Amino acid sequence: METLEGMSRSHHCGEIKKSDTGKEVTVCGWVSHRRDHGGLIFVDLRDRSGLVQIVYDAAAMGEEAFHKAESLRSEFVIAVRGEVRARSAETINPKMATGEIEIVCSELRILNKAKTPPFYIQDNLDVDEMLRLKYRFLDLRRPEMQKNIMLRHRVAKIMRDYFDRQ
């Protein structure tokens, strides 16, 4: 495992826009999905703000760095430095807020490895309630649960602000 020494997050995953094309960014988060296409590996990186696609290219990275990218698995915690580039028209994903861009990795650090989780960290899964409660720390990473917590925060803040004005 590695450290963040000398690297600091410049953006959250869900905040990178097409206007950032050409900029070098550093993002950190959990590996959500990984797809291996031979000399290319695509990883959806997730943090509290959303998802962004990371591209690992064997030709551009070098063999040792690409081998590290091949070892990535679901829920690994990683830090990535790379250049934002616009996706080609046929690869744009309208279902993602960051679907028009991707980050071409120039540096990868694996901050923490993870065992296979007992359930996938995504919405619309039929997972037993007791299993979700047992692994509450994983359940709280799901987007649906994060939305619920943010809603509760906003309601409580509105109430506090109201009573502060009284």
Model-predicted regions and their roles:
Residues 1-166:
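Class II aminoacyl-tRNA synthetase catalytic cores and aaRS-like
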